[in-house]
From Swiss-Prot:
Name of this protein: Probable 2-phosphosulfolactate phosphatase
Reaction(s) catalysed by this chain's protein: (2R)-O-phospho-3-sulfolactate + H2O = (2R)-3-sulfolactate + phosphate
Signal peptide segment: none
Keyword Magnesium recorded: yes
The enzyme's E.C. designation: 3.1.3.71
A Pfam family it matches: 2-ph_phosp
Organism: Clostridium botulinum (strain 657 / Type Ba4)
Entry-linked PANTHER family: 2-PHOSPHOSULFOLACTATE PHOSPHATASE-RELATED
Entry cofactors: Mg(2+)
Main enzyme class: hydrolase
Length: 239
């Protein structure tokens, strides 16, 4: 199995994704939100690029819609929820459709439509994702959503942890240089939050008093669900 990493949504080459399994990572916080919502019984998540598109879906849909997302880490005016996974509890999302628009994560998803399979991962479900990847048994591209088009330490080390989870299942992994680097960084910094504390995105969220979000997102493997993007929306993967 060949594994490569793309360092941000702006670095996605759509032609490279053809016939590949793609993993989208945005641990702070879009993929943590999506994974949490699906785990809590959300019917589906619709990732969109713009606020206007999200509001149009909510206006025209007959489904029970929750609008969620952020711009520059802040809740979007008129939306039900921000980009905090702690808001997407079973009480609020079970049986409902979440329309989500974020600065980085939903852009990475929408830039990956050429892939054969698109899975959603974060620290909170990395082992479950690794098991799914093993069953799919296809070459893999891990896409880091990044921060405003730039490299993001938090997504990168999460990629390294995901690779480590895969190594615990199978040894026939062929890593690109960047994938080797991510794995090396994780194996030498297994206390991920301590390593990430100086990162730009981490500092931004902490400055907004979002410590509880950070604490939640840096937990490993508390969820055994893998979301999959397919045909315009995200649902629970069944393989």
């Amino acid at each position: 199995m060949n594994i490569d990493i793309v360092i941000s949504a702006d670095h996605i080459d759509e032609k490279r994704l053809i016939n590949k399994t793609v993993i989208i990572i945005d641990i702070l916080r879009a993929t943590s939100v999506i994974t949490t919502a699906i785990n809590n019984g959300c019917k589906k998540v619709i990732p969109v690029l713009t606020v206007e598109e999200a509001k149009d879906i909510a206006k025209n849909s007959k489904e029970d819609i929750i609008l969620g997302g952020e711009r520059n880490a802040l809740k979007i005016d008129g939306f039900n929820f921000s980009n905090s996974p702690l808001e997407y509890t079973k009480k609020y999302v079970e049986g409902k459709t979440v329309v989500l628009s974020t600065t980085n994560g939903t852009r990475a998803i929408n830039n990956s439509f050429n892939a054969k399979t698109i899975l959603i991962s974060a620290l909170i479900n990395s082992k479950a994702t690794a098991k799914a990847i093993d069953k799919l048994n296809e070459d893999l591209i891990i896409i880091n959503s990044g921060t405003n088009g730039q490299f993001s330490i938090d997504d990168f080390i999460c990629s390294g942890y995901l690779i480590d989870c895969l190594y615990n299942i199978r040894k026939d992994l062929e890593l690109s240089d960047i994938a080797k680097t991510a794995h090396y960084i994780y194996t030498n910094n297994k206390d991920i939050e301590s390593f990430v504390k100086k990162a730009t995105h981490y500092s931004r969220l902490k400055s907004l008093n979002l410590e509880k979000d950070l604490e939640y997102c840096f937990q490993k493997d508390i969820i055994d669900v893998v979301p999959q993007y397919k045909d315009g929306y995200i649902i629970k993967l069944n393989i």
